[in-house]
Amino acid sequence: MGKDVPLLVASAPSLMAQAKEMMEGYTLKARKGLGQHFLISQGVLNKILAAADLKPTDTVIEVGPGLGVLTEELLKRAGQVIAVEVDDKLIDALTEKFKGYPNFRLIHSDILKTSPEEILGQNVPYKLVANLPYYITSAVLRQFLEAKLKPESMVVMVQKEVAKNIVAKTGDMGLLTLSIRFYGNPSLVSVVPGGAFYPPPEVDSAIVKIVIPQTTIMEGVSEVDFFKLARAGFGTRRKTLLNALAQGLGISKPVILSLLNGAGIDPARRAETLSMEEWKKLCLEYAGNPC
């Protein structure tokens, strides 16, 4: 008998090769004005999918599908994928690419002008997965976190420095950290080098996951009061809470001192040193003593 001859199996084209083929086929190019950087790393793609933790019954909203690299894998795992794309040049390409997927829906719209209710058409649980353009990161996060119909979780690609702010701990927290923690629990999944994209951005990125539970530590706290106090506290970061809140709220120092004492917070501390539990105490104290 002759020696066994190993079977030669053609490997799938790399994500970079797929991206170039699609861009050439539809005469596409990354649009700098839209902050487009297309994902070409299989390893990074796998990390996003693992973090998303999708089930066949899940509905997913994908913001900015780009060339559809992530979209294709989402479609294999979720019950429905609704992609929102603003770039009119990508619409035909995405429509053609996914015409064989009955669980795919494409919305040609600016995500910042489209609410979750408009996207979904009904009140259903959903997850958000997105490779966000840097220039709309904060706006998109705020839009979905503040929406009446919030996602169960968000897995987003953001600028590395923004990711560090999102997951910062007490002592380093800024207004962005605090805002996200009011609604959910953020965690860093992975740092992503520029080479994972085409064209590569000038800075590194990171994958962040935000889980939005039914109830949070801030349950019972007025959203309006919380953000009013938080913006005042961080408005002049180098100042003590006593001075920052007095200036930001336009309230006399004796009244602010009384609020801080009532919440058990040293007036000489700064906003970034407060834990979420302490912000809750301060908010409840403020609500119980209208100034």
From Swiss-Prot:
InterPro entries from the UniProt entry: KsgA/Erm (IPR001737), rRNA_Ade_diMease-like_C (IPR023165), rRNA_Ade_Mease_Trfase_CS (IPR020596), rRNA_Ade_methylase_Trfase_N (IPR020598), rRNA_adenine_dimethylase (IPR011530), SAM-dependent_MTases_sf (IPR029063)
Domain of life: Bacteria
Disulfide bonds: none
Annotated catalysed reactions: adenosine(1518)/adenosine(1519) in 16S rRNA + 4 S-adenosyl-L-methionine = N(6)-dimethyladenosine(1518)/N(6)-dimethyladenosine(1519) in 16S rRNA + 4 S-adenosyl-L-homocysteine + 4 H(+)
SMART domains xref list: rADc
Keywords for the protein's UniProt record, in alphabetical order: Cytoplasm, Methyltransferase, RNA-binding, rRNA processing, S-adenosyl-L-methionine, Transferase
Compartments, record wording: Cytoplasm
Binding-site list for S-adenosyl-L-methionine: 37, 39, 64, 85, 110, 131
Pfam families: RrnaAD
EC numbers, comma separated: 2.1.1.182
The protein's enzyme class: transferase
Cellular component terms (Gene Ontology): cytosol
Molecular function GO terms recorded: 16S rRNA (adenine(1518)-N(6)/adenine(1519)-N(6))-dimethyltransferase activity; RNA binding
Gene3D superfamilies, A to Z: Ribosomal RNA adenine dimethylase-like, domain 2, Vaccinia Virus protein VP39
PROSITE patterns in UniProt: RRNA_A_DIMETH, SAM_RNA_A_N6_MT
HAMAP family found in the cross-reference section: 16SrRNA_methyltr_A
Physiological role: Specifically dimethylates two adjacent adenosines (A1518 and A1519) in the loop of a conserved hairpin near the 3'-end of 16S rRNA in the 30S particle. May play a critical role in biogenesis of 30S subunits.
Similarity comment: Belongs to the class I-like SAM-binding methyltransferase superfamily. rRNA adenine N(6)-methyltransferase family. RsmA subfamily.
Name of the protein: Ribosomal RNA small subunit methyltransferase A
